[in-house]
């Protein structure tokens, strides 16, 4: 965590475009490199990779869907990485499937303050359980699913 730099305006620019494939591809590549180049005793034993988006892919230039899917599959199969996909204003299950992320790890969420806060609460609980348990916990993600079912899509 100490190695993570604060986000700046240059790092994050909201402009109506979603370069989702590039964001996922770059981040998987960087994190995989860090894992492989870190001494084994300091390397993360488990990796939980969370993707949160409120829009469809419409602006990537570096990575294709197939390339990202291949990268994700490699990390899942060779290193046991777990991927979670949270999406608003899209079909999260369908989008996640394009990247090789299973339906039980893909959740639609309500894109408002309460829905976003619930995302972070659920991911915090998932991470805590993930660190202490062998299988990936499903209960925290179920809260997001219930919220979506109860309150529906909001813009």
Regions found by a protein language model. Name each.
Residues 1-155:
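Acidic, low-complexity intrinsically disordered regions
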């Amino acid at each position: 965590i100490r190695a993570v730099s604060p986000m700046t305006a240059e790092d994050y620019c909201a402009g109506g475009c979603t370069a989702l494939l590039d964001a996922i591809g770059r981040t998987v590549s960087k994190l995989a490199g860090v894992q492989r180049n870190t001494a084994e005793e300091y390397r993360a034993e488990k990796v939980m990779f969370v993707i949160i988006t409120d829009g469809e892919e419409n602006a990537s230039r570096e990575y294709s869907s197939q390339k990202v899917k291949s990268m994700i599959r490699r990390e899942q199969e060779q290193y046991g990485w777990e991927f979670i996909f949270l999406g608003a204003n899209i079909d999260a299950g369908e989008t996640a499937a394009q990247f090789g992320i299973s339906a039980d790890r893909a959740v639609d969420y309500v894109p408002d303050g309460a829905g976003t806060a619930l995302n972070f609460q659920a991911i915090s609980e998932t991470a805590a359980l993930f660190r202490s348990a062998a299988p990936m916990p499903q209960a925290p993600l179920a809260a997001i699913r219930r919220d979506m079912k109860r309150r529906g899509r909001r813009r």
